[in-house]
From Swiss-Prot:
Protein name per the record: Tail completion protein
Keywords of the record: Host cytoplasm, Late protein, Viral tail protein, Virion
Native species: Escherichia phage N15 (Bacteriophage N15)
Primary subcellular site in the record, as a coarse category: virion
Pfam families: Minor_tail_Z
Subcellular location: Virion; Host cytoplasm
Function text: Stabilizes the tail structure and acts as a connector between the end of tail and the portal vertex of the capsid.
Family from the record: Belongs to the Lambdalikevirus tail completion protein family.
GO cellular component: host cell cytoplasm; virus tail
Gene, per the UniProt record: gene 11
């Protein structure tokens, strides 16, 4: 169906039903938005080696409706705390000169955090911490930065999908709406 055919189908649908075209466009937008999320999540997961499930939790799609035919993708771009990656295990250094477990490495999944330790914070949460310097309190929560990879992945994937998949999805949902109306 060319662009002329698409316009003709839209006119035909509008003459039969007022809600068919907005419903079809909302369906197409939602499909493309969900596909953009899943593709971007896959790219970020591959780049950062963070499990896909943890990255996908950070993207939410507010679906398009008949009245508002635009989908909103909200992404939590904050750093991912290392404790979320899975069960932590400390690989103790067994060398004689390393007293009291010095030079031990904390491992969580495929990640290694040298000098990392687990501690419960004042708010009751457990986190992986790391010393930043020698004095008493300078410690920080160990986290994996996701802001840059998430931003670049979504900025690259969305325009590509709008260009390639949106016309196909719109065509499919319009023909489906036409089929539903004609079989009534």
């Amino acid at each position: 169906m060319s662009l002329k055919g698409l316009e003709q189908a839209i006119e035909n649908l509008n003459s039969i039903s007022k809600t068919a075209v907005p419903r079809a466009s909302a369906q197409a937008v939602n499909r493309v938005a969900n596909r953009a999320v899943s593709r971007s999540v896959a790219v970020v997961s591959k780049d950062t080696r963070v499990p896909r499930k943890l990255v996908k939790q950070r993207a939410r799609v507010k679906r398009a409706t008949v009245n508002k035919p635009r989908a909103l993708i909200r992404v939590n771009r904050g750093n991912l705390p290392a404790i979320k990656l899975g069960t932590a295990s400390v690989r103790l250094s067994r060398r004689k000169r390393d007293k009291k477990g010095a030079n031990s490495v904390l491992r969580i999944g495929p990640f290694r955090f040298p000098g990392g330790f687990i501690q419960q914070l004042k708010n009751g949460r457990w986190h992986v911490m790391r010393r930043t310097s020698k004095p008493r309190y300078p410690i920080e929560v160990v986290s994996i930065p996701l802001a840059a990879p998430l931003t670049t992945a979504f900025k690259e994937e969305l325009p590509k999908l709008m260009e390639s998949d949106m016309p196909k999805e719109l065509r499919a949902s319009l023909t489906n709406q036409l089929r539903l109306i004609l079989t009534r």
